[in-house]
UniProtKB/Swiss-Prot annotation:
InterPro entries: Homeodomain-like_sf, Myb_dom, Myb_TF_plants, SANT/Myb. Inflorescences-specific. Accumulates in anthers, especially in tapetum and meiocytes/microsporocytes and microspores during anther development. GO terms for cellular component: nucleus. It holds the Pfam family Myb_DNA-binding. GO terms for biological process: anther wall tapetum development; callose localization; microgametogenesis. It comes from Arabidopsis thaliana (Mouse-ear cress). Required for anther development and early tapetal function during microspore maturation. Regulates callose dissolution required for microspores release from the tetrads. The gene is MYB35. This is Transcription factor MYB35. PROSITE patterns: HTH_MYB.
């Protein structure tokens, strides 16, 4: 087992020392000298622990201690030693006769450190604060700016002008694209500056035929941007893009295939209504060809419903 702390013993006094206690320890040391500090309290008649007696003698009661303030030479020596070896107060105190390590440490923390900070010197590295800031900038990469020539006002203006020129060219290209697009004309002299968007339904339940139709129409409008159609294109029908399965096979198939066909037809009707609503709300009167295409889809839809009434009578829309 380890030795318990001496201050934990029973009936041991703690706190400030009195003049009577100081006189007892001084008298004992004057007669017997410094020896085993754990036995001195009992022999001197002190109700103190050995550690407390040793610290009291070393830091306050020794006859060679100096109790006056530190001189200028002592302060300079403390600063030089601290610059060389750091906070090794015992080693610094050995160079100062009559001073304890506790005295040196307290004087450094209360006086000398603040004095150096007021002089613009870092108390840890003993370097000027301005030099430390410069080194920090070099380490962090900010100091490279001092080795670079600052751009003149003319170069800044040139960069800003080039940026504005790029933005102007981009805007002009967009306007020319929407101007020449066949989907944007209402007549030969008026056009919209905002593009027309077909919004797809959130539930993608249709076949790939709708995407192929839209991709073919978009590729036509992109490859021929300068051609303005005078009449709507009606040389194709939306039924040409359906699946290539023959109609009798669909009619004679099982109930599962009939249900799939009717579901596709139902969702296609929803998609057509959704597209027509978007056309009416966002591009009313501005896309004649698109509206005619949707009208063609709706007409063919009604024609299919009239041709296959036996497939759609059992479902409510």
């Amino acid at each position: 087992m380890g030795r318990p702390p001496c201050c934990d013993k029973s009936n041991v006094k703690k706190g400030l020392w009195t003049e009577e206690e100081d006189a007892k320890i001084l008298a004992y040391v004057a007669i017997h000298g410094v020896g085993n500090w754990s036995l001195i309290p009992k022999k001197a008649g002190l109700n103190r622990c050995g550690k407390s007696c040793r610290l009291r003698w070393t830091n306050y009661l020794r006859p060679d201690l100096k109790h006056d303030s530190f001189s200028t030479q002592e302060e300079e020596l403390i600063i030089e030693c601290h610059r060389a070896i750091g906070s090794r107060w015992s080693s610094i105190a050995r160079k100062l006769p009559g001073r304890t390590d506790n005295d040196v440490k307290n004087h450094w923390n209360t006086k000398l450190k603040k004095k150096l900070m007021k002089m613009g010197i870092d108390p840890v590295t003993h370097k000027p604060v301005s030099q430390l800031l410069a080194e920090f900038r070099n380490i962090s990469g900010h100091g490279n700016a001092s080795f670079k020539t600052e751009p003149s006002n003319n170069s800044i203006l040139t960069q800003s002008n080039s940026a504005w020129e790029m933005m102007r060219n981009t805007t002009t290209n967009h306007e020319s694209y929407y101007t020449n697009s066949p989907m944007m004309f209402t007549n030969s002299s008026e056009y919209q500056t905002t593009p027309f968007h077909f919004y797809s339904h959130p539930n993608h339940l249709l076949n790939g035929t709708t995407s192929s139709c839209s991709s073919s129409s978009s590729s036509t409008s992109i490859t021929q941007p300068n051609q303005v159609p005078q009449t709507p294109v009606t040389n194709f029908y939306w039924s040409d893009f359906l699946l290539s399965d023959p109609v009798p096979q669909v009619v004679g198939s099982s109930a599962t295939s009939d249900l799939t066909f009717t579901q596709n037809e139902h969702h296609f009707n929803i998609e057509a209504e959704y597209i027509s609503q978007n056309i009416d709300s966002k591009a009313s009167g501005t896309c004649h060809s698109a509206s005619s295409f949707v009208d063609e889809i709706l007409d063919k839809d009604q024609e299919m419903l009239s041709q296959f009434p036996q497939l759609l009578n059992d479902f409510d829309y």
